Structures are given as structure tokens and as C-alpha cells.
Regions:
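A metal-dependent hydrolase metal-coordination microenvironment
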Residues: 9-139, 144-164, 179-186, 286, ...
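C-terminal functional module detector
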Residues: 1-3, 8-9, 170-175, 180-300
Length: 300
């Protein structure tokens, strides 16, 4: 068993990818092949195209791993309720329901039944649901905590990141994801009301194939970013890759979103004391860009 684990880790590398992407096959403005090429040409290693209520299939450009995806697009009056399906094997139709919890749970379960990993999208989009509803959901491990889309109100209040902390404080195993939710490649870069690509992503430690990447997401072997790059990361240790003279603030966070330790610099570590509940790391640079490591439960 030890030899197998060592072999897997030896083959794993850091891979950058986007988990929430739209093309002209739904409400994006560019053909799927152009979208995939955009990400490949900018150094992304993998991409999940998540057009609304369909699986968009194209040939992968050389050097880019394409993972099957869909945004299951459900709603109640004035409440958009969306769940991404990552690595699924068949299209999932919106499952409907009478309450946000019922709708989301039915779609989460349907994604699982289709062989996919569910990602609960943008809770603050239309202020559709919050921490109370998330606490009632089961069978999911991924939550959008950062998004490049200008209309999904990620920062709240309350922020999607603070909802994540509520879940973690209650002992839930949930990992935080950053995504583009990209729709627009043909808009001027100066426009602020468009969903442009390249704003947020995840970096996964995995082998360079779809199955390995999806498994790494499911077990939380990744970090999320809106621009900060990390060389090393765990719940209690981080090393930042310096860029463009930026300065970095490193925070270790525990129960209730409380900052346990804070420092300036490009590396830091934290020693668990046993009363934190969980520990996760967040890095903020002097331009406001961020990176989030995944949490570790503290054994009392």
C-alpha cells in the first residue's frame, strides 16, 4: 500500500484550471473551441465547460485537459439555484422542488447519480440562499467562495466565504472554490458589468488526467485563487510565489472565521493548539488578490 501511495504522489503536479465556464452553446459569447483555446494559451492545464443544462463536447486542444461539465440551472421565483456538475457522464435535468433546500438537494443528488461531483454555485446570486440553507444540504463537498462574475454578490454581505466558515464551524467537510463563471471574451476589458475570463481559478495537485483531477477536487487537494500563486500550501503552512513586487498578508483562520494568526511576508506556519475546531490559510496581496487553502479539522 505504501508503494502505491508514493507512486501516485510522485506523478502528481500542480495543475491550474477553471471549473465554471460558459460558451456560445448556452449564454456565452464565443464558440467552445475558442474558449478552450483561450484558457490553453494562457497556461491553464484543465477546463470544465459548464453550459446551462447541457454537456458541451469538443476536441481538447493540445495541452489542455477537458472535463465534462454542466451547470444545472434551476430556480424558484426570484431565486436562481444553480449546481455545477463536474466529471458527469450524462446530462442532469433541473430536478425542481418547492424550497431552495429541496431544489438544491435534488440537484446535488442527481449530479451524484450521473457520476459527477457537485459544486454549489454562488449562494448570493439573487440572494437566493445562505448559510442556514447550506447547513441543511448533504452529499456535497465544493462551494463557490469567489467568482469573477460581477452579478453574483460573492462579497455579500454576508460573504460566501463567511458561509463556508459557518459550515466548517459546524463540522462539515466542505472545500472552497474560486471560479471565473466566464461568459464574455468579446467585450472591452474596461467594462465592469461583464463576466470576463481569467479572474479566479483553482490549482489542483493531481495527475494530468480528468479522473485524477476530479478525485483531487473531491478530497480537497487544491487551493483557490483570484491571483495569488502558492508554491506550497497545507492548512498550517504556506509559501507564496512572489509576483510584481506585491506584499503579502497571511492569515490562519479557525472556528467562526476567527483569525488565529496573522503575519506579513511570503511564508508562514501555524502550530495547532487543539481548540481551533479547524484551521485554514488565506493569503491577501497588496493589490487585493487572494488565495485560500483548504481546511483541516483539529483533533482535540
Amino acid at each position: 500500500m505504501t508503494r502505491v501511495i508514493v507512486a501516485v504522489l510522485a506523478a502528481a503536479v500542480w495543475l491550474k484550471g477553471n471549473l465554471h465556464t460558459h460558451t456560445a452553446a448556452s449564454d456565452g459569447d464565443s464558440p467552445p473551441a475558442e474558449v478552450a483555446a483561450w484558457y490553453r494559451d494562457r497556461g491553464y492545464d484543465f477546463l470544465v465547460i459548464t453550459d446551462h443544462d447541457k454537456i458541451t463536447t469538443i476536441d481538447a486542444p493540445q495541452g489542455l485537459v477537458l472535463i465534462a461539465g454542466e451547470e444545472v440551472t434551476d430556480r424558484l421565483p426570484k431565486k436562481p439555484l444553480h449546481v455545477n456538475a463536474i466529471g458527469l457522464t450524462k446530462v442532469v435535468a433541473p430536478q425542481k422542488g418547492t424550497t431552495p433546500v429541496e431544489v438544491l438537494q435534488r440537484n446535488i443528488d442527481a449530479v451524484r447519480a450521473a457520476g459527477g461531483v457537485p459544486l454549489v454555485n454562488h449562494p448570493n446570486f439573487g440572494w437566493a440562499f445562505g448559510a442556514d440553507e447550506l447547513l441543511q444540504l448533504r452529499n456535497f463537498t465544493l462551494l463557490e467562495i469567489a467568482s469573477g462574475h460581477p452579478y453574483v454578490n460573492t462579497q455579500g454581505p454576508p460573504s460566501a466565504e463567511s458561509m463556508w466558515d459557518v459550515l466548517l464551524t459546524k463540522g462539515r467537510r466542505v472545500y472552497g472554490v474560486a471560479v471565473d463563471d466566464s461568459h464574455h471574451w468579446k467585450k472591452p476589458l474596461g467594462e465592469t458589468d461583464v463576466a470576463l475570463p481569467g479572474k479566479a481559478w483553482v490549482v489542483v495537485r493531481a495527475e494530468r488526467d480528468a479522473k485524477s483531477i476530479v478525485a483531487a477536487l473531491e478530497r480537497g487537494d487544491f487551493y483557490a485563487s483570484t491571483g495569488v500563486e502558492l508554491e506550497e500550501v497545507s492548512a498550517t503552512r504556506v509559501k507564496v510565489r512572489e509576483k510584481n513586487g506585491a506584499h503579502y498578508r497571511i492569515q490562519f483562520i479557525g472556528d467562526g472565521g476567527r483569525v488565529l494568526q496573522e503575519s506579513e511576508g511570503t511564508s508562514a506556519s501555524y502550530t495547532m493548539r487543539g481548540n481551533e475546531g479547524y484551521v485554514r490559510v488565506r493569503v491577501i496581496d497588496s493589490n487585493g488578490r487572494m488565495a485560500w487553502g483548504q481546511p483541516e479539522r483539529v483533533k482535540r
